[in-house]
Regions:
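Glycine-rich, acidic/polar active-site loops that bind/position phosphate-bearing ligands
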Residues: 1-131
């Protein structure tokens, strides 16, 4: 038995939320799975079936089960408008590289930035790159 936690973005705007649901199965790979899209703003109440299509599977570092990142399709198997992963895959290639930048400041006990003179206001963003 394998426990799969399906993870997808809902239809909330302007910023979607992460949604998930769990399926325990004997399948070796995560199967497609339907859900009620009316509760995630991805379908009207009259025709609310949506389909989760597995895109990538990862081992859950906390529990050892599987996390399944999913795209969303409508009940008629069209790409759902909230499925921005699909739109990105159409313009991206395997050649693309990207990175994330996280900035840190060392501070004095009083909260001022270490290395700046006391009483002098800090400069706008961008002038603190010391590496």
């Amino acid at each position: 038995m394998t426990k799969y936690e399906y993870v997808w973005l809902d239809g909330y705007q302007p910023e979607p939320f992460l949604r998930s649901k769990v399926k325990v199965t004997n399948d070796q790979t995560p199967p497609e799975w339907s859900f009620d899209g009316s509760s995630t703003l991805q379908a009207d109440g009259g025709s609310s079936d949506c389909i989760l299509t597995p895109v990538q599977e990862y081992t859950n570092p906390l529990f050892g089960d599987k996390l399944v990142m999913c795209g969303v399709q409508t009940g008629s198997r069209e790409v759902h408008p909230s499925n921005t992963r699909h739109a990105a895959s159409e313009v991206a290639s395997d050649e693309w590289w990207f990175g994330f930048e996280q900035e840190y400041f060392l501070t004095n006990p009083d909260g001022t930035i270490l290395g700046l003179e006391a009483g002098i206001p800090s400069k706008p963003q961008g002038d603190y790159f010391w590496g």
